[in-house]
Amino acid sequence: MREIVHLQTGQCGNQIGAKFWEVVSDEHGIEADGLYKGTNDQQLERISVYYNEIGANKYVPRAILVDLEPGTMDSVRSGPLGGLFRPDNFVFGQSGAGNNWAKGHYTEGAELVDAVLDVVRKEAEGTDCLQGFQITHSLGGGTGAGMGTLLISKIREEYPDRMMCTFSVVPSPKVSDTVVEPYNATLSVHQLVENSDETFCIDNEALYDICFRTLKLSTPTYGDLNHLVSFVMSGITTSLRFPGQLNSDLRKLAVNLVPFPRLHFFMTGFAPLTARGSQQYRAVTVPELTQQMFDAKNMMAASDPRHGRYLTVAAMFRGKVSMKEVEEQMQNVQNKNSAYFVEWIPNNVLASQCDIAPRGLRMSVTFLGNSTAIQELFKRVSDQFTAMFKRKAFLHWYTQEGMDEMEFTEAESNMQDLVAEYQQYQDATVEEEGEYEEEVIEDQE
């Protein structure tokens, strides 16, 4: 079967990852001790994508937990699923990266990376036909960002033909953890553009807004935010974990969503989102789901899709949904909002369906959009980066770990190129394509 090896790095990555495994284990009927207690055969049909079967009815996640300090991993170990993971798959240092990307990427992280790669190899060898890796991390810190991107490039070297898919928490404009976030994020994006195949952008501020506005939580905790992220992760991977047709593996997903290799940063969304108290008072319909899914308030990255155009979209419906109705609704959205979809990629909106709905819902949908509006997110980080970098603020933290200013300049220009590329395809029209071809013919004559 097509297995996926899951890595979680840094504090953020480990917390999101732990939540993800809670949700997935619950959906597959796997208890905290790894024993299968489910009722539905479909739960086991493609269980090997994420789990190793090690005995009669006992399953262990293909997860590798990495951090440069023991704290977060201790809390995962003492959490509800602590006994589920393989003890050898906890790889941690003692020093911490102190939110310093250079420490994660060049000094502290580089010392630990071989130990992690050994575990990666062991997991990869235990698979039948590995389809790829997924990694959860944040881009604003030291370990998840610095060491996370180091791991990605090392794994890329060793498994060049396997998919690399990242769930990346991007620093948000208003909620900031550390002052050097723009540096760490820019250096990370510089790596992700080159080494990742699919990056799902998640952003704390957008998650806060959803918790606050839609879920009516007055003081959202990180637990609530991570719960939202785990919905999306579970939804994105549904088509990989349960029998289904479309986007049934990471590569097919990428082929459908990535028109140009560098533009692989997706916005994610989930519906239905309702306040906890009012869930049982409404029946969700496909039109409602489709409406909410395309709603800007539903995006888990702080950029507004109405400011750009969708290059491609994938929607994964779950539950007992009529595919005919889904197709009609999706077509409906495209017809009404045709200005927001590029017209030079025909059939750029795809929908897939899986019978098993998430716990507590009759039907749900997960949204993935490759929108040119994601440039807002990079532009914002880039502006903050430039403001600090032109004063060379805080640079000594990085240079004393052996980094060069040149690397900052490179990362900055790579990110600006990325923004420009998104803008170029946002402005592109079918006519331009035609004009371009005519010019080529004239040149040849």
Curated annotation (Swiss-Prot):
Q: Where in the cell is it found?
A: Cytoplasm, Cytoskeleton
**Which example biological process does GO assign this protein?**
microtubule-based process
Q: Where does Mg(2+) bind?
A: E69
Q: Does the keyword Cell inner membrane apply?
A: no
Record key words, sorted = Cytoplasm, Cytoskeleton, GTP-binding, Magnesium, Metal-binding, Microtubule, Nucleotide-binding
Cofactor(s) in the UniProt record: Mg(2+)
- One Gene Ontology MF term: structural constituent of cytoskeleton
Q: Which Gene3D superfamilies match?
A: Helix hairpin bin (1.10.287.600), Tubulin/FtsZ, C-terminal domain (3.30.1330.20), Tubulin/FtsZ, GTPase domain (3.40.50.1440)
Q: Which GO terms describe its cellular component?
A: cytoplasm; microtubule
Entry-linked Pfam families:
Tubulin, Tubulin_C
- In this chain, GTP is annotated as bound at Q11, E69, S138, G142, T143, G144, N204, N226
Role played: Tubulin is the major constituent of microtubules, a cylinder consisting of laterally associated linear protofilaments composed of alpha- and beta-tubulin heterodimers. Microtubules grow by the addition of GTP-tubulin dimers to the microtubule end, where a stabilizing cap forms. Below the cap, tubulin dimers are in GDP-bound state, owing to GTPase activity of alpha-tubulin.
Q: Family assignment?
A: Belongs to the tubulin family.
What is known about its subunit structure? Dimer of alpha and beta chains. A typical microtubule is a hollow water-filled tube with an outer diameter of 25 nm and an inner diameter of 15 nM. Alpha-beta heterodimers associate head-to-tail to form protofilaments running lengthwise along the microtubule wall with the beta-tubulin subunit facing the microtubule plus end conferring a structural polarity. Microtubules usually have 13 protofilaments but different protofilament numbers can be found in some organisms and specialized cells.
The protein depicted here goes by the name Tubulin beta chain
In which organism is this protein found? Schizophyllum commune (Split gill fungus)
Q: Which gene encodes it?
A: TUB-2
